[in-house]
Amino acid sequence: LRRQRQMCIRDRTEGELWVRGDHICYIGDGTDTSAVCKEDDIIIWDREIDAKGNLLMPGFKNAHTHTPMTFLRSFADDLPLQEWLQQKVFPNEARLKGEDTYWLAILGIMEYLTSGITSNFDMYIMQDYHINAYVDTGFRTVFTSGLNNFTDSLEVLEENYLRINGLSDLTSYVPGFHAEYTTSRP
């Protein structure tokens, strides 16, 4: 239970946020809680956080990420895109092992959280290792398939869809195109 803090919903207001289990069950001023509990219920919380003087607001969402690429940030970023990809990115990515993408994704997730990013849309190579980083950290992600010239068969995409959507309530999978320069068919 969190009381007496500023909340950024539409307008700044004083209010409360209640969490039951891993779901937000109430946001409001604390007077009309009938949707959450009966009037004569005694509510006992595991903990109450006094956040007076703080601001509670929704987390940011990053809608286009390749999370394990944190290791290439600012690496030869003065090159034109195709030159950067062909000469710098792809050769370095080719040296990665599955476990590397797992730990690089963990690093990226930690960076997201320190920046207020609470969910993302992501795509990257070696997705089984990569997606496990999201499941293990409990970070909300929508993993996209990266349809392109290198894409597996539609059957494999369907298997991935069924498998990844069943891993966690916080993890989902949708088809998505990677980029115009990796897809030759219209």
In which residue ranges do the predicted regions lie?
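Histidine-rich, glycine-flanked metal-binding segment
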Residues: 10-57
